[in-house]
Amino acid sequence: MVLTPEQQYQQSWLERQDYAERMQPLIGSLYRNRGIEICVYGRPLVSASTIDIIKSHKTVTKYEGDKLRLRESYEFLEIIASLNLNPAKIDLGKLAFGYLYKDAGHGLSKTDYVKKALESVLDQEQKPEPQDVVLYGFGRIGRLLARLLIERNGPVANLRLRAIVVRGGKDGDLEKRASLLRRDSVHGPFNGSITVDNEANVIKANGTYIQVIYADSPDSINYNDYGIDNALIVDNTGIWKDEAGLGLHLKSKGAAKVLLTAPAGGDIKNIVYGVNHNDVEPTDNIVCAASCTTNAITPVLKAINDEFGINNGHVETVHSYTNDQNLIDNFHKAERRGRAAALNMVLTSTGAAKAVAKALPELKGKLTGNAIRVPTPNVSMAIMNLNLEKNTNATELNDFLLDVALHSDLRDQVDFTSSTEIVSTDLVGNRYAGVVDSRATIVEDNRAVLYVWYDNEFGYSCQVVRVMQQMAGIEFPSLPFAE
């Protein structure tokens, strides 16, 4: 019987659904029980629907030109599940596509090829020790960090969210904070179950038992009283930004290290993961994760500087409003920021361009920067006007940045889009530090203008989690390694 085109399409779709459904329990088990995060060309598959798994495979076609069939990637997923692996992020798409279409196996069987590609985490004796984490503050970034840490919860969770610290509130405070975790106007509902234990001051979320501690100062807490020790304190309040202030956390019993989710002053290391994360030493007790804008632009600037050289440039950020601004006109100590955030474009300053030099010293003194706050609640854009050392063209520059996004050591920081229809809301929840909008790239000789989107909340929070892992000495490699 000859099938009609419609019947062929329906049969093909049902087959893809079938394989996606078979993949789901393997992906979930690998993540929960062994700490292995499966993705396809950077798109995470943990907790993904069958439709999301199918869509992730379309990404391969977009970037590589050839199809990766779900039945092909399913075979490789079964091999991964059969191996004794340490926690890692494994790109199933690159693994399968490399073997099937790029001859990366060099005559090896599929199993031997996978073993070779994953040998750095195969049959390793040493398992990472889990790190207790305390979120000091529970605002926009704090709640997104909580979502990310809860998402990673399981028997082999490397980062264990043990507590959040907030100022004392009135009756109903705990329910309100749990509700803010449960519902978010920008990022949508929490994916899971949240309950509150008022007697114990605990929020229970997807198997994570989160102690809520009420305190008025960072040096007044005994974390040992809650079974927490050697904790990494993630200060997301933005109140203390120097060594003296952040050092107060270390006076609390059970606290070991402090990470600030904002730019820091003085000699505190400003870390942009992917660029200078190896500067974090075991003896560093206080570190900062820089700003969302610095995280968005620095990886792209590093890649371009390494390949083309940068003489100088200007970075203009078109930034969503934040809760530092006023809802309606009122007094603010900063110029213009007192005007209604949701009604105005507000010209203001940013230290992001100068802060790049803290992570990338070779660009010190080469960049200027300014910012425009705009009436959108999330997702921002950096426009980088650069004078390069070498002449190039838009095609060459975009091809290079696509390769950076797919195959370089910055592939977890730099994303890439060639869509002519993408707008800011499409990028809410994007897990990369920045997304290069290739259709907007302008190049003439050695002058280049690049447009880089970034989710200034969620993408930044993902970078913060990576810095947390670095501070905890947790190895979580992305495999296969960059080509």
Predicted regions, residues:
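N-terminal Rossmann-like NAD(P) cofactor-binding subdomain of oxidoreductases
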Residues: 2-326, 334, 466-467, 474, ...
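A generic structural signal for alpha-helix starts
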Residues: 295, 391-392, 458-459
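Glycine-rich phosphate/pyrophosphate-binding beta-alpha loops
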Residues: 373-377, 453-460
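Short pre-catalytic strand/loop immediately N-terminal to key active-site residues, enriched for Gly-Thr
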Residues: 284-288, 447-452
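Generic C-terminus detector
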Residues: 448-454, 463-483
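Short beta-strand-to-loop capping motifs
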Residues: 166, 386-390, 452-454
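C-terminal substrate-binding/catalytic lobe of Rossmann-fold NAD(P)-dependent dehydrogenases
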Residues: 2-57, 307-309, 313-446
